[in-house]
């Protein structure tokens, strides 16, 4: 299975510019014939313009229309990062996943909202996990700050997810946390971990740190970006996961009765 990551330049509050960047980068990425393409958090408007209500996507219609069209056009699975979606009287930081036919196969609302940036004052936290199959491979998704909560990823591992995607908007100031925790989640859960950041800046001017990476269950970075706009592509060998489970069977040895 081949995975491409789009470390997009995200313009604050400029949906049309960001959609154009997505189209351009996806077209370039398809030269490597990926099976799955993954986008960063809030790629549509950035993290996040004020007043947020002015920029939200009503029922996710704009994002879903574009992502479905592109998935079908290029016959590729798309893990659609996340977008700011207005649903009735609340706003969600939501990831949509589309299959090669352009059909919606999963959605996930960010579970842990970043209170230091007052994200919890503007968005509603999610209430479900998301596990889904792409080409017969069980996958899961989380978003950004979720990375700091290992319990979620262990639940995904217990759900037998082989690949976990993490669309994010992570700052340069804490980028070493990003690198360390992403690698740890891959190793401790014996999964392929696809961590996708943006490039550019937050609405407050703080720079995004980039460093998107595709990491195997041994913790090896199969591909990694710097802070600039980038397309990463790596082939993942799912037999590696089987190998590590045979070699170090942590799920057999864990003491669930104690924790």
Model-derived features: positions:
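A conserved C-terminal secondary-structure "cap"
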Residues: 242-259
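Short beta-strand scaffold segments in enzyme catalytic cores
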Residues: 80-82, 94-97, 130, 212-214, ...
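Cys-nucleophile CN-hydrolase/nitrilase-fold catalytic domain and related Cys-dependent amidase chemistry
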Residues: 15-101, 107, 171-191
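Short beta->alpha transition motifs characteristic of CBS
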Residues: 45, 52, 96, 108-114, ...
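CN hydrolase (nitrilase-like) catalytic-core segments centered on the catalytic cysteine
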Residues: 60-79, 148-232
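Active-site-proximal beta-strand elements of phosphoester/diester hydrolases
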Residues: 1-14, 38, 94, 107, ...
